[in-house]
Amino acid sequence: MSETINTAAQFPSFEKPTVQFNEKGWGPCELPDTFKDVPYQPFSKNDRLGKICDWTNTSSNDKKYQNKYASSFGTGNQYSYYHEEDETTFHLVDTARVQKPPHQRGRFRNMRNSRSGRGRNARGGLNTHGMTTLSGKNVKARDPRHGRGMGKKFGHRGPPPKMRESSVAVRADWASIEEMDFPRLIKLSLPNIKEGVDIVTCGTLEYYDKTYDRINVKNEKPLQKIDRIVHTVTTTDDPVIRRLSKTVGNVFATDAILATIMCSTRSNYSWDIVIEKVGDKVFMDKRDHTEFDLLTVNESSVEPPTDDDSSCNSPRNLAIEATFINHNFSQQVLKTGDQEPKYKFEESNPFISEDEDIQVASVGYRYKKWELGSDIVLVARCEHDGVLQTPSGEPQFMTIKALNEWDSKLANGVEWRQKLDTQRGAVLANELRNNACKLAKWTVQAVLAGSDQLKLGYVSRINPRDHSRHVILGTQQFKPHEFATQINLSMDNAWGILRCIIDLVMKQKDGKYLIMKDPNKPIIRLYDIPDNTFDSDDSDDGEGDDEGFQQVYNYAHNKI
């Protein structure tokens, strides 16, 4: 068998390509039609072409190398995307939460604290076996849902801050002179201020009934409504200060006004004080028909009372209730009656005439002066609420105040009926947190008056929903200077704040000024206001000057 070889088979031929010669440069002379109008983009062979998508891992571990897949040349802008707002494509979407079926509820609940989306006991997840866990108390403290711990750090937002209203509306014709922020006021100090010297003493005091020291939660006593007149006369309306201003001092005020200024760094609510400069004399006044004399409730609390005027637990209604309780308590704990002994000062009550037959509250007035340096002499009217007879026969003057419990659940406080007898310190500490400004002002008033004791009463509602009936659950007494140290109240700083404001006003021209605490910022502002501002007889354009505040009561003669 033989094989036949076909020699006529054709082999593939090689055609020599045509090489174009470019005399003017390099590269081809003509561009093929398939590559016309195609933009050129520089590239590098080392550039990564893409990234593998991992749909199971939601965490990003490439934060340090976010440009890992970018071009090395930084070019190619012709392919970049630029966002332009297109209103034609705008449409609303339904944001309502879709109810999950029962089998999917709580499916990923245990994956919050695990890294990279793994479970607690999965591979690479968080293993809780053999680990020390936090106690329930610590978990509550660290949980952002409870308002503490690291809630704000991780974006957990709380309720929006409440915008408080100003105590007086700032008008266009008022000129702002100075702004004093609290951090700067806290650093002020005026040490070595001696005790005030008595100039005039007026009024009559009743003796304290020691049986109220034995009151406790199990032996409570109802709070009585005592019909007595309490005078809260401002500085320029005081006849004694008018008389003393001709011979003694160059700065005049009352203890309530001084305490408000000295404790201004602890206040949250807005307040204002009118100052008149006449020559080298300065008079500090409160405006008529304002809420200056009302006692605030839970002013410094983390959750202050809600602004609902229809509720008995609104800030204004609670302030009226606290003032009512304070006035009645300070008179009930005294020995009243015509046969009971009384302590009389040198002069009678300056706010009542001899022919008036009215029952006045037990109040003793001390007009004292202080040397503040730089020829500044302060004259102020201070008050005592009662007197205590000591075994040695010497009288001890008292400042009597009352703390009130309205609703411990709404106030986020301590229930007095459970803790007052056994843990009184915890109750007082809670009150110091919620009413820091009010307690500080009471302490300053007691120190200015030279009281030997500061008597605090604990008064609570019989029913949390009834704000008209109250009971006395206990009393507690302190020495004013020791209590000031206990609540971290520096009298040197208080005098420094007062001296700073006095020096600022002394540099101004004669006229009327107003100090106001900003309702929402820790700032005190000094305004230059027209001389006829807040005058009751000013009725230009039929528009009263007292538009900025709401008339509450005439506290010049207020019955309780």
Swiss-Prot record:
GO-annotated cellular components: eukaryotic 43S preinitiation complex; eukaryotic 48S preinitiation complex; eukaryotic translation initiation factor 3 complex; nucleus
Annotated keywords: Cytoplasm, Initiation factor, Phosphoprotein, Protein biosynthesis, RNA-binding
Localization of this protein: Cytoplasm
Basic residues: bias regions: 100-121, 147-156
Annotated stretches, region: RNA gate: 291-305
Listed InterPro entries: eIF3d
List of residues that carry Phosphothreonine: 128
Positions of region (Disordered): 98-166
Keyword flag Kinase: no
Ranges in a coiled coil: none
Signal peptide: none
GO molecular function: mRNA cap binding; translation initiation factor activity
Methyltransferase recorded as keyword: no
BP terms from Gene Ontology: cap-dependent translational initiation; formation of cytoplasmic translation initiation complex; regulation of translational initiation
Protein function: mRNA cap-binding component of the eukaryotic translation initiation factor 3 (eIF-3) complex, which is involved in protein synthesis of a specialized repertoire of mRNAs and, together with other initiation factors, stimulates binding of mRNA and methionyl-tRNAi to the 40S ribosome. The eIF-3 complex specifically targets and initiates translation of a subset of mRNAs involved in cell proliferation. In the eIF-3 complex, eif3d specifically recognizes and binds the 7-methylguanosine cap of a subset of mRNAs.
Domain notes: The RNA gate region regulates mRNA cap recognition to prevent promiscuous mRNA-binding before assembly of eif3d into the full eukaryotic translation initiation factor 3 (eIF-3) complex.
Assembly information from the UniProt record: Component of the eukaryotic translation initiation factor 3 (eIF-3) complex. The eIF-3 complex interacts with pix.
HAMAP family (UniProt xref): eIF3d
Annotated family: Belongs to the eIF-3 subunit D family.
Protein name: Eukaryotic translation initiation factor 3 subunit D-1
